[in-house]
């Protein structure tokens, strides 16, 4: 198999790990048992190589948020969840430098608690009163990234590791707008990162690498956890200007209700912690 990425994808160790995860996530055991069969995996590989393998349209679900609203997530079929989970882990492994050090989300060993602890330490070290910096939230980040940036991310993977049938499968899925709504009716609309799909985690981290690089180079402390951002330090004003400008260039924007300037004498909430 000359397809390096596909060969790594079908490594038996990855499938064992993914199937174990599937048990913990309550994926039906009959589906997982199918995937333990070498003939099943060989048939999947053959279909991918021939361009015949497709991820099924997801089902939508409404998940409540902290402010009482709901967000739409896209839930994949059981086998597709396993396939996409393996693909997501592999993408992180293949392209570690596409995730900037200031981006902390969806990575093994890094949780919200450790991010908030470090941010609290940086705030405590900041001298002076008044405005310390800001926190912000991207407006519908998972729903608003244009497809060209998703394609560019996959292009970078293939530029380094060679063309892959697995990347073809992912591209095809991200270009497919079909989904089933809560009433099981087939619908179509652009889903951007497809929040709920495992690969959305990798995409959410890597697509803002250039912005992460620019903001982390300013005077201050910058950290991002998916669509939540925090900047503490002297350049907070400049950082906000650059943030809004760069997002606008990518057809994205901040949620104005979630932009908050941080004061030395006032508590604030970040990633669920106060």
Residue ranges and their predicted role:
Residues 46-68, 167-183:
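Reverse-transcriptase-like RNA-dependent polymerase core
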Residues 268-274:
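Short, low-order "capping/linker" segments at domain edges
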Residues 1-44:
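Non-catalytic, polymerase-adjacent accessory regions of viral genome-replication enzymes
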Residues 69-100, 189-217:
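Conserved pre-motif C helix in the palm subdomain of viral-like polymerases
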Residues 122-226, 230-246, 250-252, 256-263:
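Conserved polymerase palm-domain catalytic core
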Residues 84, 88-146:
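Active-site-proximal segment of RNA-dependent polymerases
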Residues 106-114, 230-233, 262-267:
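Beta-rich nucleic-acid/ligand-interaction surfaces
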């Amino acid at each position: 198999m000359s397809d390096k990425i596909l060969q790594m994808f079908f490594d038996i160790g990855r499938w064992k790990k993914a199937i174990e995860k599937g048990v913990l996530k309550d994926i039906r055991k009959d589906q997982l048992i199918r995937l333990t069969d070498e003939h099943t995996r060989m048939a999947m590989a053959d279909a991918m190589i021939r361009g015949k393998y497709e991820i099924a349209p997801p089902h939508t679900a409404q998940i409540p948020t902290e402010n009482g609203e709901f967000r739409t997530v896209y839930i994949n079929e059981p086998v597709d969840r396993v396939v996409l989970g393996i693909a997501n882990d592999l993408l992180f492994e293949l392209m570690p430098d596409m995730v900037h050090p200031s981006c902390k989300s969806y990575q093994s060993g890094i949780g919200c608690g450790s991010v908030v602890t470090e941010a609290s330490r940086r705030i405590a070290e900041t001298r002076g009163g008044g405005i310390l910096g800001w926190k912000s939230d991207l407006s519908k980040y998972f729903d608003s990234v244009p497809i060209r940036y998703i394609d560019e991310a996959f292009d970078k993977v293939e530029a380094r590791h060679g063309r892959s049938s697995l990347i073809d499968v992912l591209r095809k899925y991200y270009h497919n707008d079909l989904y089933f709504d809560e009433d099981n009716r087939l619908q179509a609309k652009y889903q951007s990162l497809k929040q709920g799909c495992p690969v959305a985690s990798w995409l959410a981290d890597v697509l803002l690498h250039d912005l992460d690089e620019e903001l982390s180079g300013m005077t201050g402390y910058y950290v991002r956890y998916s669509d939540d951002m925090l900047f503490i330090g002297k350049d907070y004003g400049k950082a906000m200007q650059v943030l809004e400008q760069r997002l606008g260039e990518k057809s994205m924007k901040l949620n104005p209700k979630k932009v908050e300037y941080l004061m030395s004498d006032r508590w604030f909430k970040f990633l669920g912690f106060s």
